Amino acid sequence: HHCADPACLAGCPAEAYEKDALTGAVIHLDDACIGCGYCTMTCPYEVPSFSDRLGIVRKCDLCHGRLTAGEAPACVQACPTEAIRIQVVDIDAAGTSWGLAAGPDPALTRPTTTYTTTRPPVDRPSAADLRPQPGHGHPALAGLLVLSQWAVGAAAAGRPALALTLALAASLASVAHLGRPLLAWRAVLGWRHSWLSREVLALSAFTPLAAAAALTADRLPLRVAAGATGAAVVGCSAAIYAVTGRRWWRLPRLLALFGSTAAVAALAVAGLPLAVVAAAALAKLAVEGGVIRHRSTARGERARTARLLLGPLSAQVGRRLALLAIGLAVLAAVPAAGIALLIGGDLIERGLLFRAASPDKMP
């Protein structure tokens, strides 16, 4: 896949992709890759793949060296039935139709690949719809999201020292996610087009503001500034996943989910009455479980997500609910333990956000 509007290139925070103007090939620059794996989420066709051995993503470059030398790519030359062909395409027509009745919406990235094949029936659910498989939990990303949002909540509650501690822990989690952590500095290079770069910049601004608020007497201006950058962190985090096109990761839902996480954190840390914290937690729980209403739908991404949450991932859902209930029960008597349990429950919930995501894939 070498798209007219490649999502891998647009999402990459490290500027590790480039698109050749002559051939249209989307080329991955191994030396620039930091191994965040975000392009594996933004690409709906699962073309970039993460190499555990190398700590970076690898991708077909359409044998760019062969093309520039006037030769066909290796796959074209090797195919014994001549089932693959490279040809000049009309960029304006890219993504309008690609010959597949199923699979991701081509309008997302305008792929220039065209399939000539017998169309599968579209009036029946596929095997993937009936028996979806859980995805990767991305524990470091889950930690980054939860800890950063709890840090924002702690800052809003007037607890800058706790906010600083949580923000530093979130930053460590973000680096732990990288395949090449020594190149973490490259994560800000794509700020013009990558929401991941913008999240890094927002969190980098929030952390010192939280530190300054913790160390100075006149905290109000710093708290306001920390609150503004904290809101930017939450917004950027939601946009990172919303742009992947997954229906369960739509922007309104993620803003509600991430924002309610920060709200529950603020209420819990501020020591407000248990009824207030519980009401906010239940509202957040409604956002988490809203997808369950699609459990009886025959096919589709949200139907698969509902089946995963009620089936293979039901034990994790149970643990998440148990930690929430116990955390609320002990919050008033032992605030530190209650907060720790609530954070633990949110970590499970955020892992489910990744594991239960079941986007449309290639048939």
Predicted regions, residues:
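Ferredoxin-type iron-sulfur electron-transfer modules and their immediate structural context
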Residues: 1-26, 30-36, 40-42, 46
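Flanking helices and flexible, charged tails adjoining ferredoxin-like Fe-S electron-transfer domains
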Residues: 4, 32, 40-141
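Short, highly charged, low-complexity non-transmembrane loops/tails of multi-pass membrane proteins
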Residues: 102, 301-306, 357-363
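N-terminal signal-anchor module of multipass membrane proteins
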Residues: 110-111, 115-158, 164, 168, ...
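Long, contiguous internal "core" modules enriched in hydrophobic/ aromatic residues
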Residues: 135-139, 143-149, 157-160, 193, ...
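Membrane helical hairpin/interfacial module
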Residues: 159-205, 209
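Juxtamembrane/interface segments at transmembrane-helix termini
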Residues: 178-181, 287-297, 351-360
